[in-house]
Design a protein with these regions (language model features):
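N-terminal nucleic-acid engagement/recognition segments and initiation subdomains in replication
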Residues: 2-3, 15, 384-481
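Acidic carboxylate-rich catalytic motifs and surrounding loops in phosphoryl-/glycosyl-chemistry enzymes
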Residues: 22-28, 145-146, 347-358
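TOPRIM fold recognition
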Residues: 1-6, 201, 217-402
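Non-catalytic accessory segments of DNA primases and related replication-initiation nucleases
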Residues: 1-132, 255-257, 262-267
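Short, basic/aromatic recognition patches
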Residues: 131-148
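Short, hydrophobic/aromatic alpha-helical segments in well-folded domains
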Residues: 130, 211-212, 235, 361, ...
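Phosphate-handling DNA/RNA-contact segment within nucleic-acid enzymes
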Residues: 109-112, 150-244, 262, 271
Length: 481
């Protein structure tokens, strides 16, 4: 928890959300405070916060809660303070209480958004009308509807409509032409384009709707839109679970202009032009440090998952506050697509442009070089799955491996596994001791391996288990008389 409101402002600045002069943060919880961050052009405030003011039993004040900008959410982190062990325990308990409250509120918002999505989707028309976004992107309106001059894109989890994305004809002052229905739980939500059945053998996955339309047009194959790079992995996980034998091709965005984006950022925000470069040797490619006035800069470029990123920090003072802003600029499209492909045994392809261009995705390729060029680059016959190639198990191991695939489910983002026979959680290290390193490493590398989010482990004594969840209830204990 933050010990002062200045700590909260510095945490905001560290992720690029700058509180403007004249706006004082204040405890607003349970209501939200809002402001237009420095650099925003549109009039509607896009930055928000909800700050709780609390006191320890000794009377010391600390602040908890969350903040963000548009759909981005950050929890207020603990800051250094001379807390006693008792106070640290109190603060930890309060943090747990607020996390549980936050999760419940998010679920309530998601439920309301899902109901609203059904209502608006039923009101939206299917009649194709002229729309500047469609014309600008050279696409047909696959799978969408129209409502008040907006394209309405459905967002599903399995077969349930959980939200909507709205696309406007023109970008606003801040370059934004899309928004999600407020409260939508976007993680794992997708939009299908084309017919997908249990017999589907080939399916493409993309980030954005326009890219999805272009890929569907070029390949005449079903496409799934994940809406953003960070959502590729959870969406592909769902597809792989539903279609374990299908060939999945991730047609990724190549956000390749990281170095020029970093140079522009430093010039616009600090009026400095640091030397930033990259070569092809090694993971850490380039390191640069300099001090300009009261600005201290340390920045380096590094290569990860086949993409170059710019990292480091900038230290400076603003309105009497000492700011240490983290720099973390990556080729999110390439990085996230590569990770998802490796995790789930998918093929991976990025657009290649023949001329100097600002294009980054397959829609840009269609607009600039034509549908035929995109079709050629997207040919699935030329693509092989990423990740370690699994050798077929020997006959003596086959039964063991199939049993492990059926019995265990990996908990996403952890080293913990759900054992469906014992009805308990177990660490992967313990599994290796039980079944051997060879068998468990094979299981981890097999795209058929089951995986689930922790929140989808549910306790349902009545047996009414929500779709996509695992029931951890294994019956009431029987106590003899």
């Amino acid at each position: 928890m933050a010990s002062t409101l200045r700590d909260v402002a510095e945490q905001m600045a560290s992720v690029g959300i700058f509180v403007p002069e004249g706006h004082e943060l204040r405890p607003t919880a349970p209501k939200y405070g809002r402001f237009r961050p420095v650099g925003q052009k549109s009039k509607k405030p896009s930055a928000w916060y909800r700050i709780y003011e609390n006191r320890t039993s000794k009377g010391n004040i600390y602040y908890a809660g969350s903040f963000g900008i548009r759909q981005e959410i950050y929890l207020i982190k603990p800051s250094a303070g001379d807390w006693t062990p008792e106070e640290k325990k109190e603060i930890a308990e309060k943090a747990k209480e607020l996390r549980e409250l936050y999760q419940k509120e998010r679920q309530d918002l998601a439920d309301r958004a899902a109901r609203k999505a059904v209502e608006l989707w039923s009101k939206a028309g299917e009649i194709v009308k002229p729309h500047k976004y469609l014309e600008r992107k050279h696409i047909k309106p696959y799978g969408c509807r129209f409502l008040q001059k907006q394209l309405v894109i459905p967002m599903y989890k399995d077969k349930a409509l959980v939200g909507l994305q709205f696309i406007f004809e023109e970008k606003n002052e801040d370059g934004i032409d899309k928004r999600f229905l407020t409260g939508t739980d976007t993680v794992g939500a997708f939009c299908p384009l084309g017919k997908i059945t249990e017999d589907t053998k080939l399916i493409y996955v993309v980030e954005g709707y326009a890219t999805g339309c272009s890929v569907h047009e070029a390949t005449d194959e079903p496409v799934v839109v994940a809406f953003n790079a960070g959502n590729l992995d959870p969406v592909v996980q769902r597809i792989r679970a539903a279609l374990p034998e299908a060939k999945i091709v991730i047609a990724g965005d190549d956000d390749r202009f990281v170095l020029s984006r970093a140079r522009r950022f430093f010039k616009e925000h600090f009026d400095i032009s640091p030397e930033i470069g990259a070569n092809t040797k090694g993971k850490i490619q380039f390191v640069h440090s300099e001090t300009v006035g009261d600005i201290e800069l340390e920045v380096y470029t590094a290569k990860k998952d086949g993409a170059t990123g710019v990292f480091g920090h900038v230290k400076y003072e603003k309105n009497g506050r000492k700011i240490n802003q983290t720099i973390n600029m990556t080729n999110a499209g390439r990085t996230k697509a590569t990770i998802a492909a490796k995790n789930h045994g998918c093929c991976l392809v990025f657009p290649k442009f023949s001329q100097k261009t600002t294009g980054t995705d397959f829609n840009d390729l269609v607009v600039e070089e034509g549908l035929q060029e995109a079709k050629q680059q997207l040919l699935a016959t030329n693509l092989k799955p990423l990740g370690q190639k699994q050798k077929e198990p020997e006959e003596g191991d086959r039964n063991l491996y199939e049993m492990i695939l059926e019995r265990y489910t990996l908990i996403y983002g952890t080293t913990t596994v759900w054992d469906d026979v014992v009805g308990d959680l177990i660490d992967i290290a313990a599994l290796r001791l039980a079944w051997g390193k060879k068998a468990i490493d094979w299981w981890l590398g097999d795209f058929r391996r089951k995986m689930i989010y922790k929140e989808n482990l549910v306790l349902c004594p009545d047996g009414n288990v929500p779709e996509g969840c695992i029931n951890i209830f294994k019956g009431w204990p029987i106590i003899p008389d």
